[in-house]
Regions:
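Single conserved hydrophobic/aromatic residue that forms the stacking wall/gate
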Residues: 1-8, 12
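Short beta-strand element of the alpha/beta-hydrolase
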Residues: 17-26
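Short amphipathic alpha-helix adjacent to the substrate-entry channel of hydrolases
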Residues: 33-50
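Alpha/beta-hydrolase active-site loop
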Residues: 59-78, 97
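Short glycine-enriched nucleophile-adjacent loop
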Residues: 92-103
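Accessory cap/linker subdomain of secreted extracellular hydrolases
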Residues: 109-199
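Short beta-strand/loop motif that positions the catalytic acidic residue
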Residues: 200, 206-208
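Conserved alpha/beta-hydrolase "acid-adjacent" motif
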Residues: 213-223
Length: 230
């Protein structure tokens, strides 16, 4: 049980397999989405280690990439010869950054990802808001330092108010694109905040849609494709 022994996540073992995929499926390594992801990966013959930023918490505030580095080493120490990673949405961004950093990852699935690192955010309850950006924080960190990131144009509490406005009061953040589109339109990206996908080893699968209701993942994937061609 990895969760008890190392605090990394939940392992779903596939009998006889010496390959593993790190699954980044949401806010809990043992919820329905994680189990569905693990089941699909099992059908494809691999062990699965599901991880999340926190237990029942999808906040991304300087999430230490060392956790994924430790998970890779744990998997290698426990008989896995090949290691992949799969993530969705913000966790798809996490998967790309990790794969660009750790050469032991030789299979990467990024589902509806961004091609750059975002400012850190928290979820919960604060001043009537269910999500808010964290000033000066990135979504990810490495060696104790936040990664360079694209800041949100909106601060708390306007950040959540914009979500409410766009979703007609439902607060369904997965149906709100203004945070991301407006923030990108506010300034040019720096090279430091872009994900160096050209450093990813092995196979890379990028999956998205033009009509994504959350952010412009189709555009992000095209930019990554151009970066790889260059």
């Amino acid at each position: 049980d990895v969760e008890r022994s190392r605090g990394l996540g939940d392992v779903y073992k596939r009998q006889g397999s010496d390959c593993a995929v790190i699954g980044l499926f949401g806010d809990d390594p043992n919820d329905y989405m994680a189990k569905c992801g693990a089941k699909w990966l099992h059908k494809n013959g691999v062990n699965v280690l599901c991880m999340s930023p926190g237990k029942k918490n999808y906040s991304h505030v300087n999430f230490p990439l060392e956790r994924i580095e430790t998970a890779i080493q744990w998997l290698k120490n426990n008989g896995n010869q090949k290691i992949g990673i799969m993530g969705m949405s913000t966790a798809g961004m996490d998967a790309l950054v990790a794969a660009s950093l750790f050469s032991d990852i030789t299979l990467t699935f990024a589902l509806t990802p961004s091609d750059f690192v975002w400012q850190g955010f928290e979820q919960g309850e604060k001043d009537g808001c269910k999500e808010w950006p964290i000033p000066g924080a990135s979504t990810l960190s490495w060696k104790g330092e936040p990664l360079a990131y694209m800041p949100f144009i909106y601060e708390h509490p306007v950040y959540w108010q914009k979500i409410q406005e766009e979703t007609k009061g439902s607060g369904d953040i997965e149906r709100s694109t203004c945070l991301f589109i407006d923030s990108e339109n506010a300034r040019e990206h720096t090279e430091e905040e872009m994900i160096p996908v050209e450093n990813i080893k092995g196979r890379l699968f990028l999956v998205g849609a033009e009509d994504d209701s959350f952010w412009e993942t189709g555009k992000y994937i095209r930019r990554m494709d151009e970066r790889l061609k260059e």
